[in-house]
Design a protein with these regions (language model features):
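Bacterial N-terminal signal peptides that target proteins for export
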Residues: 3-22
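C-terminal motif of bacterial Sec signal peptides marking the signal peptidase cleavage site
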Residues: 28-32
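Flexible "stalk/tail and boundary" regions
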Residues: 35-366
């Protein structure tokens, strides 16, 4: 796998929905139509670059709104795209919507700007979906990998994509399913790193890949010593190194999301006892080594952080809510990748159309 940026998140304060297996039902349902049969002509008019987040809208509660409608409004999942220069109260520059799905989780982009997410259609199941760069409205996915016994995906804890479009999905309380960029439909993983044993994986909760084929995994659960383990393509199941210890400022369960830059530096969105920080480690970091930089403090405006992503212009983006467990609307905080200590973000934005992020506060940037 080759990549400079990968995103996958899970925040303990919010519980993600467990996804059921399915066949190809979802793929057919997404063939260019909204839930009410409406089609849109402009499905590839979005800007090439942007900041992507998820808005999951629940159906209206029983009451006047629901009773006023002749039809039942279903829950919907939408990908919102904002400008990388967004600030303040922002308006999306584009959306991927009308997908006939009830919820979305996790976001990632590959080297060409294609967008990846997992989508749930009611009770029929879930797939990993890829949308072309510039997708908008009810754009059709170019590929979909369903969750079933063949793909060995059931309840993923995240999603990482490298520059070529290879996928890595950490499975809850299990291992890592890896798919080649050509994988499509109900196919077996190209490779699978099994949990337990030599891999030391207990409950992998996030993933990222770098340009040197290193696969970073956040590992949690009982008997886990170091919260980050690193594999590469020559691994036979055992990690090549791990990162953890008092000097790292991480504890088991504290990393919420991870990402890498083109130089191979590792960025960790970290929460310890409700206090958030962004930790940056050098590419060769191993064992109980301190981070190169640690962005934390009141000036940062970090509340309880979730997803993290990087652009190619020297900025990192993190999603934050006021406190862990908060249902308040999320905020994107933008920092320089060279920032350190108690610094203010260079920009922040919220949006009136982004009020209910996915449980993992996912974000992707291209």
């Amino acid at each position: 796998m080759k990549s400079s940026v990968s995103i996958a998140t899970r925040t303990p304060a919010r519980t993600a929905t467990a996804f059921a297996p399915l066949g190809l039902t979802l793929v057919l349902a997404l063939a260019g139509c909204s839930g009410d049969g409406t089609t849109f002509g402009d499905t590839n008019g979005a800007p090439t670059t942007g900041v992507y987040v998820i808005q999951n809208t629940a159906p209206p509660a029983s009451g006047s709104v629901a009773k006023a409608s002749a039809t039942t409004t279903a829950a919907t999942g939408t990908i919102l795209q904002f400008s990388t220069s967004a600030s303040g109260a922002a308006t999306p520059v584009s959306t991927i919507a009308n997908l006939n799905v009830t919820s979305l989780a996790y976001l990632a982009v590959d080297g060409t700007g294609d967008i990846y997410t997992t989508a749930t259609e009611g009770t029929t199941g879930t797939s990993v979906l890829e949308f072309p760069v510039n997708s908008s409205n009810n754009a059709q996915p170019t590929r979909a990998i369903p969750f079933n016994t063949t793909t060995q995906i059931s309840v993923p804890n995240g999603l990482a994509v490298d520059a070529a479009g290879d996928l890595a999905l950490p499975e809850a309380n299990s291992g890592i399913a890896i798919f080649a960029s050509t994988a499509n439909g109900s196919v077996a993983p190209t490779d699978y790193i099994a949990g337990g044993g030599a891999s030391t994986l207990v409950n992998p909760t996030a993933a990222a890949v770098d340009t040197d084929d290193n696969l970073y995994i956040v590992n949690s659960g009982e008997d886990v010593t170091n919260p980050i383990v690193v594999f590469n393509t020559t691994s036979t199941g055992a990690p090549i190194r791990s990162i953890g210890g008092a000097l790292t400022a991480m504890t088991v369960g504290s990393p919420q999301a991870i990402a890498t830059d083109a130089a191979g530096n590792l960025y960790v969105a970290n929460v310890v006892s409700g206090v958030s920080s962004i930790l940056i480690f050098e590419p060769t970091a191993t064992g109980n080594t301190p981070p190169l930089r640690d962005i934390t403090g009141s000036n940062t405006l970090l509340g309880c952080v979730g997803g993290i992503a990087l652009d190619n212009e020297g900025y990192l983006y993190v999603v934050s809510v006021p406190t862990c467990g908060s249902t308040a609307s999320p905020t994107v905080l933008k920092f320089s990748t060279t920032g350190d200590g108690n610094i203010a973000p260079v920009a922040t934005f919220t949006s009136a159309t982004w009020t209910n992020a996915d449980p993992t506060l996912s974000i992707a940037v291209y």
